[in-house]
Swiss-Prot record:
One of its GO terms (cellular component) is cytosol. It is found in: Cytoplasm. Belongs to the DapA family. Its EC number is 4.3.3.7. This is 4-hydroxy-tetrahydrodipicolinate synthase. It catalyses: L-aspartate 4-semialdehyde + pyruvate = (2S,4S)-4-hydroxy-2,3,4,5-tetrahydrodipicolinate + H2O + H(+). The gene is dapA. It holds the Pfam family DHDPS. Catalyzes the condensation of (S)-aspartate-beta-semialdehyde [(S)-ASA] and pyruvate to 4-hydroxy-tetrahydrodipicolinate (HTPA). It comes from Listeria innocua serovar 6a (strain ATCC BAA-680 / CLIP 11262). Pathway: Amino-acid biosynthesis; L-lysine biosynthesis via DAP pathway; (S)-tetrahydrodipicolinate from L-aspartate: step 3/4.
Amino acid sequence: MDLGKVITAMVTPIHPEKNKVCKKRIHHLVNHLIDNGSDGLVIAGTTGESPTLSHDEKMKLFRQVVETNAGRAKLIAGTGSNNTAETIAFTKEVAELGGIDAVLVVAPYYNKPNQDGLYAHFVAVAEASDLPVVIYNIPGRSVVNIEPETIIRLAKLPNIIGVKESSGNLDNISKIIAETSDDFLVYSGDDSLTLPILAVGGNGVISVASHVVGNEMQEMMQAYESGDVKKAASIHRSLLPLMNGLFSVPNPAPTKYLLNQQGISVGPVRLPLVDLNAEQGTKLQAILEGLSK
């Protein structure tokens, strides 16, 4: 299955006065992302502030993105949680919606399952629905790391098609790529590791930076794929300050700040996250402006 090279982990537009998921702003953002380099979108993931979205808000978000997308980009819905039964029920509900190409299922957080528990969790979710499953390994947030051996075992299941790897461990990522089939998708979950992961055989990136430099991310991908590694490396180096700047305070506050500054109204972040202060915003804007110099 081809989900594309640059997949944007989409922020969730919130109405600034009503503090509600905003249909009009969703429509505008989806069109902006597709028109500016995104092959696919992850909806209601970490960058989409999934912990502070209600179930009903997530379903509203999915419906509106599906409607606006109209089949143009691949859509991946975040349905994971630390409750296996809840994840299964939510994934089934999303499957009935139509228009969703795959689900992103995060490693169960807080309850700290061992590798056997992680394996059983993903097997149960994958077997409960026909929607393809992308594993999300992010030990920095979930506390548990899905070991390469566990991912390699899971990759043998027909409905588990890939992994978003945010462990930052290139040795582990290389092992996964080497010991899974060619059609198992391995995506960088960190913008700054996109090029290194491509170099060891990865498929692309689930990106935050592509909200504002999606075309540049595509250019880097295309340069690498065409064999112009020097050009790809040059683009990577030029984008690195922005990639790091977007995580200077908790994500997605910096991304929302830049989008709002560019006229793509996505509103504020929800508590317990807070928006950038004036000093933080000025520094981030200077980084973005420095890319064109």
